[in-house]
Amino acid sequence: MKIVLQRVSQASVTIEGSIHGQIEQGLLLLVGVGPDDSQEDLDYAVRKIVNMRIFSDEAGKMNKSVQDVAGKILSISQFTLFADTKKGNRPAFTGAAAPALASQLYDAFNQALSAFVPVEVGVFGADMAVSLVNDGPVTIVLDTKNK
C-alpha cells in the first residue's frame, strides 16, 4: 500500500456536487492499493497511521498522534499513487491492484482504522473533488513495502 498522509485542520470530499465526507482536525489519507498487498500491509499501515506522532504538543513539538488529539481521518482511494511514468508522457497504472482486490482491501483498511478514530470516506472508483487545509504543512508518504 502507498498512502499519502496530510495533517489537516479541515478536509472534505464532494461527489456529484454533494459533500460526502468531511472532517476538522485530523488526517487526510490518499490510499493506493498494490497487487501484492495483503492483510499484513493493511495492519502495518493502520498501526503506523494511528500512532504516528505528527501533531504538536503543548511545547509545539510533534509528539502527539491523531488519537491523542481526538482527530478524525478522511480516507480517499487513490490508484494513481501507483502511476508508472518511465515511458512517454501518459502514466500507466498497471502497478495498481485490480479494482476488486483494491476495493476489498480499501474497505477493510477503513474498517480497521475506525476501531481507533472516526473515519470518513470517499467512494471507491468515483470522481471526487477533495478540499483540504493542510496544517503545517505536514505531508508524509507511507509505503508498506518499505518497512
Swiss-Prot record:
Keywords: Cytoplasm, Hydrolase, RNA-binding, tRNA-binding. CDD domains: Dtyr_deacylase. HAMAP family: Deacylase_Dtd. PANTHER family: D-AMINOACYL-TRNA DEACYLASE 1, D-TYROSYL-TRNA TYR DEACYLASE. Belongs to the DTD family. A Gly-cisPro motif from one monomer fits into the active site of the other monomer to allow specific chiral rejection of L-amino acids. An aminoacyl-tRNA editing enzyme that deacylates mischarged D-aminoacyl-tRNAs. Also deacylates mischarged glycyl-tRNA(Ala), protecting cells against glycine mischarging by AlaRS. Acts via tRNA-based rather than protein-based catalysis; rejects L-amino acids rather than detecting D-amino acids in the active site. By recycling D-aminoacyl-tRNA to D-amino acids and free tRNA molecules, this enzyme counteracts the toxicity associated with the formation of D-aminoacyl-tRNA entities in vivo and helps enforce protein L-homochirality. Homodimer. This is D-aminoacyl-tRNA deacylase. It comes from Streptococcus suis (strain 05ZYH33). The gene is dtd.
